[in-house]
Amino acid sequence: MDDYTQSINDAVKCLRQGGVIAYPTEAVYGLGCDPFNHDAVAQLLTIKKRSIKKGFILIASEWKQVEPLTEPIDPKALARVFDTWPGPFTWTFPASKEAPHWITGQHSTIAIRVTAHPLAKLLCQRFAGPLISSSANQEGEPPIRDVKILRLVFGNKIDKILEGPLGPTHRPTPIRDAITGEILRL
């Protein structure tokens, strides 16, 4: 990861200044920002032409970065989640009062993934917190896997692109309910 140190540091600086970045994930390029910065999230919603009602997925480098945003769940259910992490699996949890409404949208849950992607994980570690992870696309368009297309579509609309290899998955991550195990998106 030494080859990416400066790029990650630049991305973290951008995030701390309220910027919106693109970065590689397990499947596609993601667009993200500081989930606690309302202005940054509003900018991301504008860029994606996305309704605030939909909510966002958060990625983290470890559970403790996102645990305060969730209500406690049954230990067996939590163990099932932990069996898939770190990895390309997103789970919804009951949202705590700490979870901003602009992240949960119209839902009483919050969607979380502890990422296994080396750059995304390092980005969360260096940022010292979770990030929004939304597929790099505009509403209704397919997610972007190629940095050249990313630049064409988003150009100067985003503040920083952290280039790097994508993970081996070719579709956005599945989403499951952490309490029931129900598949919400394949």
From Swiss-Prot:
Transmembrane portions of the chain = none
Q: Which GO terms describe its molecular function?
A: ATP binding; double-stranded RNA binding; L-threonylcarbamoyladenylate synthase; nucleotidyltransferase activity; tRNA binding
Provide the alphabetized UniProt keywords: ATP-binding, Cytoplasm, Nucleotide-binding, Nucleotidyltransferase, Transferase, tRNA processing
| PROSITE patterns, per the entry | YRDC
Q: Does the keyword Cytoplasm apply?
A: yes
**Pfam (any one):** Sua5_yciO_yrdC
Name the major location: cytoplasm
Question: What job does this protein perform?
Answer: Required for the formation of a threonylcarbamoyl group on adenosine at position 37 (t(6)A37) in tRNAs that read codons beginning with adenine. Catalyzes the conversion of L-threonine, HCO(3)(-)/CO(2) and ATP to give threonylcarbamoyl-AMP (TC-AMP) as the acyladenylate intermediate, with the release of diphosphate.
Q: Reaction(s) catalyzed by this protein?
A: L-threonine + hydrogencarbonate + ATP = L-threonylcarbamoyladenylate + diphosphate + H2O
Q: Name one GO biological process term.
A: regulation of translational fidelity
Q: What Gene3D superfamilies does the annotation carry?
A: DHBP synthase
* Domain of life where this protein originates: Bacteria
Q: Name the InterPro entries for this protein.
A: DHBP_synth_RibB-like_a/b_dom, Sua5-like_dom, TC-AMP_synthase, TC-AMP_synthase_SUA5
What protein name is recorded for this chain?
A: Threonylcarbamoyl-AMP synthase
> Any idea of its EC number?
2.7.7.87
Q: Which family does it belong to?
A: Belongs to the SUA5 family. TsaC subfamily.
Is Nucleotidyltransferase one of the keywords? yes
Q: Which residues form the YrdC-like domain?
A: 5-186
Location of this chain's protein in the cell = Cytoplasm
Its GO CC terms are: cytoplasm
